[in-house]
């Protein structure tokens, strides 16, 4: 069984035009039982939850994160394993929108108390990088 681990929705304006209604209809049609939505914000999270519940598809909420590291960015997805983490992601997403730049240290300080409630998904080219090792050690 195939599960898409990185769906972006229309709430990620520059990366997707997928609306939740059509997404969940397509998932049902294709007999997919789960989906992971990882937009760079949580604007559509409640609507996605309602559509998932209505359709019977298991939704894993996530957030695409870009952190300043040196002169570059460290990008990864953080996925919720609990309702507690879902609310923390809502809070983090709001803080991202209100502050200029987040660092690896800022992010680690925000999530350190929740380390059993989330999963980090790192893109392959970063898996062995110094940046990922640094983030992993902080958390």
Identify the role of each PLM range.
Residues 1-139:
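Phosphodiester-processing cores and adjacent nucleic acid-binding clamps
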């Amino acid at each position: 069984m195939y599960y898409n681990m990185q769906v972006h929705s229309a709430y990620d304006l520059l990366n997707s035009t997928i609306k939740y209604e059509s997404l969940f209809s397509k998932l049902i049609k294709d007999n997919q039982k789960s989906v992971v939505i990882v937009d760079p914000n949580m604007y559509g999270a409640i609507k996605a939850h309602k559509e998932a519940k209505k359709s019977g598809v298991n939704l894993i909420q996530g957030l695409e994160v870009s952190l300043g590291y040196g002169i570059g960015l460290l990008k990864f997805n953080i996925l919720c394993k609990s309702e507690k983490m879902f609310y923390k992601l809502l809070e983090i997403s709001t803080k991202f929108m209100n502050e200029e730049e987040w660092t690896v240290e800022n992010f680690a300080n925000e999530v350190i108390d929740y380390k059993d409630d989330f999963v980090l998904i790192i893109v392959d080219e970063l898996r062995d990088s110094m940046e990922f090792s640094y983030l992993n050690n902080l958390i």
